[in-house]
């Protein structure tokens, strides 16, 4: 697996590109559940496949590199990248996974994105796993998929590099009212000694009309903060929000939208961007916008919890 410090990208692979579409890159045909159970009986589908399916179910859209990272964190080492490719291809052929890539007329993305298929749902439910996937999930547009991939990248970076990492949850419900419902893209809990901090992850992409969509999300967070009740949805304190942007300039663009609409969540909002997750240490990768003598400046922070 390519290490973080070996990645020399100047632009995030999860940034929005004009004219980019997603293309199906799986295998055509039908595979019955009877064929699947036969493969299980012959030990052609093992605990490794189940582990991968659980990852994909939890994180919804995921790259092979992210799968490898999760396996390594669980102490499972696949010493040859070709073995991983072969394993994933086998899971595609048996309709356990589906695969897509992003591309424009000029170029194709260097990575591919995996998601669940119906047969995987059956297998996981047989093991009493509460499967989140539904068939329409695979029809989600590029911007939604890239938002998910950026969220996953940040969570996995924290999980692998920060000793204070305690847990993560995808699409955690923060507010569930009659009219409005708010789910964080991701949710991370840090714990160090008696200190426990919750952070809601909000990935922002430069998709079409992204500013309007951001304002709608910010208003939901405003409602959540204003009506927060201790103990609801397992929260004892108001969480911080970490905005995951495409690049450094995008952090300023996101903050401008917040400031112009008086939705700054003073003291609660932090900012980072995709490529910073490749840093060896994440301690200085979060930022805040500071008001200083009638000026606003971007301030990198030194956060002990990110060591």
Role assignments for model-derived ranges:
Residues 2-29, 39, 70, 135-307:
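Electrostatic, structured charged patches in enzyme active sites and in nucleic-acid/phosphate-binding
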Residues 1-128, 138:
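Nuclease-adjacent, charged terminal/linker segments that flank catalytic cores
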């Amino acid at each position: 697996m390519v290490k973080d410090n070996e990645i020399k990208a100047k632009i995030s692979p999860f940034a929005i590109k004009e004219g980019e579409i997603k293309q199906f890159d799986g295998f055509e045909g039908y595979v019955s559940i009877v064929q699947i159970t036969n493969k299980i009986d012959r030990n052609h589908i093992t605990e490794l496949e189940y582990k991968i399916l659980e990852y994909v179910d939890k994180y919804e859209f995921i790259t092979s590199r992210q799968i490898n990272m999760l396996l390594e964190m669980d102490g499972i080492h696949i010493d040859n990248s070709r073995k991983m490719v072969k394993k994933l291809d086998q899971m595609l052929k048996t309709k356990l996974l589906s695969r897509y890539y992003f591309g424009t007329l000029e170029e194709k993305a260097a990575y591919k994105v995996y998601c669940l298929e119906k047969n995987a749902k059956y297998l996981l439910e047989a093991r009493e796993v509460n499967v989140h996937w539904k068939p329409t999930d695979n029809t989600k547009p590029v911007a939604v998929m890239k938002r998910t991939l950026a969220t996953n990248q940040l969570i996995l970076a924290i999980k692998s590099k920060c000793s204070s990492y305690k847990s993560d949850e995808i699409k955690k419900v923060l507010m569930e009212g009659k009219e409005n419902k708010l789910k964080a893209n991701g949710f991370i809990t840090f714990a160090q000694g008696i200190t426990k901090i919750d952070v809601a992850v909000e990935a922002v992409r430069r998709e079409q009309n992204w500013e309007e969509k951001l304002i709608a999300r910010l208003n939901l967070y405003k409602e959540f903060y204003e009506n927060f009740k201790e103990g609801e949805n397992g929260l004892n304190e108001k969480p911080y929000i970490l905005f995951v942007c495409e690049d450094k300039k995008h952090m300023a663009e996101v903050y401008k939208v917040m400031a112009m609409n008086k939705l700054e969540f003073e003291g609660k909002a932090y900012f980072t961007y995709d490529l910073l997750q490749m840093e060896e240490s994440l301690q200085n990768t979060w930022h805040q916008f500071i008001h200083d003598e009638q000026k606003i400046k971007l301030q990198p922070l030194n956060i002990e919890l990110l060591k």
